């Protein structure tokens, strides 16, 4: 597993580790993968392309892993793939901008278009939204999400009234908040990574905007919601494939096993946790597909794009697990307002 142990995406690491270890324990209890026991090797990707490349290269050449599961920002994903050099498949788990992530890679996360089109249409219909503003970090995912948001707004009959992209780690939001104040949007779409999203949402509420503007956060989950200050979640929405309050499609049993296994010592199970759990099962399915536990052969199997539908079929789950759920924050929980088929 290659995860960010610190930095903006570090807040997801514990939940992802917990879910992956649970999946590995389940498979090992039932005989492993083609008779071989799963051993999880963890490494920190860091937050630069150089560190992500080095981490992946170490897993492939020194640890001799058969597969890699990763949750990284989109700007680090190519570095991980290059570091693996086709020696092991790369299962990329988070919400991302969409598209093929390259030979040897399988994607399990939902995409911006799957989230934005139905969610913004719902905002227009049910919240009478007409004016939309976009805020994001300045890297590949939000840049692509900006264009996807523009298209989704036009499809929904709304008006795009402004945008702002900020570097990682920026905490001075005065200029961006002034732009939002001047633009007077009904909805602000936020595509920021991990802790950056938490900090911006907090500043947004402190500026008094949350009473009159709706926020739609992309790639935002219960871990981030819990990190917000009291009173900072008014009119805050998020869209994910899973929320802990919206269990179903046999995820109830998974959540119960997760809770029982860790007895509250791990964060609430989130969409990122679930996708890391599924990724372990996908690696097992890839080994079954090629007939042996062999990283090169499994990576070669993924040279053409493997659709998410096909990935779910291989692990014996319905693609209904990838349904998009639009939820509104109520305290430290999300309450689902609408579910859409991805």
Regions found by a protein language model. Name each.
Residues 1-342:
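Extracytosolic ligand-binding ectodomains
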């Amino acid at each position: 597993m290659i995860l960010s142990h610190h930095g903006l995406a570090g807040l997801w690491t514990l939940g992802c580790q917990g879910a992956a270890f649970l999946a590995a324990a389940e498979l090992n209890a039932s005989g492993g993968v083609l008779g071989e026991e799963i051993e999880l090797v963890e490494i920190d990707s860091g937050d630069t392309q150089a560190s992500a490349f080095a981490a992946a290269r170490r897993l492939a050449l020194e640890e001799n892993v058969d597969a890699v599961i990763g949750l990284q920002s989109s700007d680090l994903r190519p570095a991980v793939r290059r570091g693996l050099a086709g020696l092991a498949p790369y299962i990329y788990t988070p919400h991302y901008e969409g598209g093929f992530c390259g030979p040897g890679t399988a994607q399990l996360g939902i995409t911006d278009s799957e989230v934005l089109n139905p969610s913004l249409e719902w905002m227009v219909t049910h919240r009478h939204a007409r004016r939309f503003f976009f805020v994001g970090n300045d890297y590949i995912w939000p840049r692509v999400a900006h264009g996807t948001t523009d298209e989704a707004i036009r499809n929904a009959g709304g008006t795009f009234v402004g945008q702002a992209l900020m570097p990682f780690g920026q905490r001075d939001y005065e200029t961006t908040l002034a732009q939002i104040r001047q633009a007077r949007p009904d909805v602000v779409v936020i595509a920021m990574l991990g802790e950056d999203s938490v900090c911006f949402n907090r500043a947004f509420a402190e500026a008094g905007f949350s009473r009159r503007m709706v926020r739609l956060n992309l790639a935002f989950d219960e871990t981030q919601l819990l990190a917000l200050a009291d009173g900072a979640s008014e009119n805050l929405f998020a869209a994910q494939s899973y929320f802990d309050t919206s269990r179903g499609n046999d995820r109830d049993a998974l959540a119960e096993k997760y809770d029982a296994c860790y007895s509250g010592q791990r964060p609430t199970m989130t969409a990122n946790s679930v996708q890391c759990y599924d990724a372990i099962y996908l690696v097992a399915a890839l080994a079954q597909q090629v007939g042996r536990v062999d990283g090169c052969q499994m990576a070669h199997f993924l040279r053409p794009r493997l659709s998410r539908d096909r990935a779910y079929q291989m692990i014996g789950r319905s693609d209904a697990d990838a349904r998009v759920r639009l939820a509104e924050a109520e305290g430290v929980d999300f309450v689902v307002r609408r579910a859409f088929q991805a």
